Design a protein with these regions (language model features):
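Bacterial N-terminal signal peptides
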Residues: 17-27
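Sec/Tat signal peptide C-region and signal peptidase I cleavage site
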Residues: 30-33
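Bacterial N-terminal signal peptides that target proteins for export
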Residues: 2-17
Length: 253
């Protein structure tokens, strides 16, 4: 065999060895990545609830439930300014079986969509609308819609102020408890779940403390709120809970 042929054969052999090494390393890396990746979250059943903490006499609870099915004196639900079919286009919105806002709209025979589409409720940031649902349509006695404004300008920081609006309206209405649904995922907004839930919690507590301060100065009177239930979908319950617990802890330091 000529020297040239031998060198060529040796180059091919070394090349094959290199390829095999790369394949071996790749397989090993994939195994390590699989071992180190976060475990898949366990499926959380609808109806699951957990008390995440208590602040100033208010029990703050998480619940896997949609806003049309939660038993509460006041149900708070959030909506953006209307865009055609916004809660029904999946993706980005959650599919109808998992979309609490779709269920709420259906429970009220399409009236949520109707009042948004016709501009009767524009959904501008902090705009509110109080609805008394007909008997048997949903479990809450009252429904409060809070506007989130332009979806393209959404920031998680907004939810602190939205939480404040929710608590202030609850105190005005004199309810003992209320449930809150941000409905961001329902509307197709890929928001940071823990941060949003934590910000809502902060706003709720801050608003309550402000009113308590005014009451102590004899500048306000109100019936205490003793329970706030933050709703979450099955896939977001645990993550939301972490944000809620962190927010509660920040008021105890």
């Amino acid at each position: 065999m000529s020297t040239h042929a031998f060198q060529k054969k040796d180059e091919i052999r070394r090349g094959l060895i290199g390829v095999l090494l790369l394949v071996s390393i790749g397989l090993h890396t994939n195994r390590v990545d699989a071992q180190q990746s976060d475990p898949q979250p366990k499926a959380i059943a609808v109806g699951t609830s957990k008390v995440w903490g208590k602040v100033d006499g208010i029990v703050i609870e998480g619940l896997v439930q949609g806003p049309s099915s939660a038993s509460t004196e006041l149900q708070v639900a959030c909506v953006f300014e209307y865009t055609e079919g916004d809660i029904f286009k999946s993706p980005p919105a959650l599919p109808p079986p998992l979309n609490g806002m779709v269920h709420l709209d259906e429970a009220l025979k399409g009236q949520i969509t109707e009042i948004r589409k016709t501009g009767k409720f524009a959904g501008h940031a902090f705009e509110i609308l109080l609805i008394t649902p007909p008997a048997g349509t949903m479990k809450a006695r009252k429904l409060l819609l809070i506007g989130l404004g332009d979806r393209d300008k959404f920031s998680p920081d907004l939810m602190i102020s939205i939480g404040k609006v929710a608590m202030r309206e609850a105190l005005i209405l004199g309810v003992n408890n209320f449930a809150f649904a941000s409905d961001l995922k329902d509307a197709g907004i890929d928001s940071p779940t823990a941060l949003v839930a934590g910000n809502v919690t902060k706003g709720i507590i801050e608003a309550y403390r402000t009113q308590a301060y005014l009451k102590a100065k004899k500048l306000s009177s109100f019936k205490p709120v003793t329970r706030v239930t933050l709703l979450a979908g099955p896939a977001f319950f645990s993550t939301a809970g972490e944000g809620i617990k962190n927010a509660i802890a920040s008021f105890k330091n």
